[in-house]
Amino acid sequence: MTSLDALVTALGDRLVTDAATVTAYSRDSSRAAPEGDAVALVLAESTADVSAALSWANEQRIPVSVRGAGTGLVGGANAYSGGLIISLERMNRISWIDPQNRLAQVESGVVTAEFDAACREHGLFFPPDPASAKQCTVGGNIATNAGGLRCIAHGVTSDSVAELEVVLADGRVMRTGALTRKNVVGYDLTRLFIGSEGTLGVITSAVVRLKPVPPGAPRTFRASFDRLEDSGAAVTAIMAQSSTPEVLELMDSFSVEIVESFHPTGVAVPSGAMLVGQTVGEDAEEQANAIVQLCSSMGANETEVSDSDVLLEARRRSNPALNARGLKISCDVGVPIASLATAFEGIEKIARRFGRRVSTVAHAGDGNLHCTVDAPDSAEELLVADEIIDEITKWALSLGGTISGEHGIGSVKHHELSWQLDSVAIDVHGAIKSALDPNGILTPGRAI
């Protein structure tokens, strides 16, 4: 039995061993990945707490899982048996907001939507906008390089990060990046840690880039189609225009049906799929009308433009609605925009071949698709759901896509790595991991 005496001395009541409390922090939102029985939980309140915890774990060769808000979907934050959990939820301070330079320093445990609201008091906003923004944390967004609804206009999380504070596996603390727009000093360590899913170090704070809130009132639009592939073709056409929306999402008929049964919004279930999006700026109304007119010319049978957020709220509720149905297996694939219609055709063929319904929601404007299959509590049905999602993932790869657009790899997608990365790339990843975490304590067996 490993002695926790040194950690108790360093952390006091911030070290928790109560079994019920530890269990509550032992997994993320994925139901398809198992968790272990950790020996203790660190409720870190400072970088020094994280440093002490990692220094101890490294000396003891104890595996560490790192947790923000637990909204991840790939088992990346799940506990290890005999391991240590480090929770960053108490590191929830916004250190400063600098409107002149459009920068802010924030600790990793700050909830994304709350941080965005604080920035808006200064006429600015934080660009990353995951569907779970009201629950997820800035640190979690950085660790997975999260995307979200506004990606097509503002990029992924890495495009909004200037500096990081990172605690390495041995407890040493380092800073990466610079406040300036240009910085070519040394390797780009900031981007190395972004999206590393806790395998290279624990991100404790960041300086992030903000943008000014667009003038005028945003406009929301909807276009419904009889066929899923027609909606994909419309997305390709929309994104080829000189002016594109800030948000462009897709929900197929099954996903709208699921959301409406979970939390009715009054949104009509389309025959095939619907596009929902948002335009911003003083010409938002003009932009939205142009988009729905384009959609109508490409087969949309029903369109609308409004100032209501109901449509986007329905999209944000898709994952909670799916979770309410029970165990599910999902993917997070990405495909080139021009291949969306082909991707949807393939997904429908796979679903028909297996005789199962597949729900698809997408950050359509950047080609990021989330396909989900219900997996009832039987080993046989779970295997079928896994096989369907694997087929969809391989189909996306055949179109020049990726196995993960924003959720990360964690443990759920670990078996897919070799489908996308060649052996040399995997060796390079391993070399980087060994250099920064020679004892392999940081989320071992996940991400890479």
Spans of features found by a protein language model:
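N-terminal accessory segments
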Residues: 1-30, 60-62, 294-310, 398-403, ...
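N-terminal flexible segment immediately upstream of the FAD-binding catalytic core
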Residues: 1-55, 72-102, 253-264, 306-330, ...
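C-terminal substrate-recognition/cap domain of FAD-linked oxidoreductases
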Residues: 17-27, 212, 224-391, 395, ...
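Active-site nucleophile and cofactor-binding loops and adjacent substrate-binding regions
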Residues: 45, 68-69, 128-137, 363
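FAD-binding subdomain of flavoenzyme oxidoreductases
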Residues: 93-249, 441-442
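Activity-critical C-terminal alpha-helical subdomain
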Residues: 172, 414-448
